[in-house]
């Protein structure tokens, strides 16, 4: 599984693609189909949102398809909205684990 992450604040050149561990049992796993890129993500990457500390994966919303987990059938299309990027990786990933309250 790959994710876009930054380890220091800065311009777009601080973004890198890295491998991350697979999600644990009991988590809803969503294969991302689209993730927003917006001014909020730019502010996070530049260090203007003090609550987000590196290393961090940007992305506060997106949509995808459930591929594993509890609560929804596999293949269900879902929209994900925050608090991604605050204490958990954002939506700029191939796969996102989502808490029950973070999905529609």
Language model features: what each stretch is:
Residues 10-17, 39-41, 74:
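Short N-terminal binding/cap micro-motifs at the start of the first secondary-structure element
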Residues 79-104:
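NAD(P)H dinucleotide-binding glycine-rich loop of Rossmann-like/cofactor-binding domains
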Residues 5-8, 46:
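Residue-level signal for short segments within beta-strands and strand-turn junctions
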Residues 42-44, 90-91:
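Conserved catalytic-core motifs of eukaryotic protein kinase domains, centered on the activation segment
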Residues 1-2:
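Extreme N-terminal starter segment of soluble prokaryotic enzymes
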Residues 19-21, 97:
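Generic structural detector for well-ordered beta-strands
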Residues 16-18, 52, 92:
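Residue-level marker for the onset of beta-strands and adjacent loop->beta junctions
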Residues 21-36, 46-87:
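Glycine-rich beta-strand-centered segment in the early N-terminal region that forms part
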């Amino acid at each position: 599984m790959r994710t876009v992450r930054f380890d220091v604040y800065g311009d777009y050149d601080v973004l890198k693609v890295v491998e991350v561990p697979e999600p644990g049992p009991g988590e809803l796993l969503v294969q991302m189909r689209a993730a927003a890129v917006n001014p909020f993500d730019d502010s996070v990457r530049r260090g203007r949102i003090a609550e987000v500390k590196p290393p961090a994966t940007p992305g506060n919303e997106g949509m995808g398809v459930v591929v594993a987990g509890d609560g929804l059938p596999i293949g269900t299309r879902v929209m994900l909205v925050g608090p991604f990027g605050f204490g958990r990786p954002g939506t700029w990933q191939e796969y996102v684990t989502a808490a029950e309250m973070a999905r529609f």
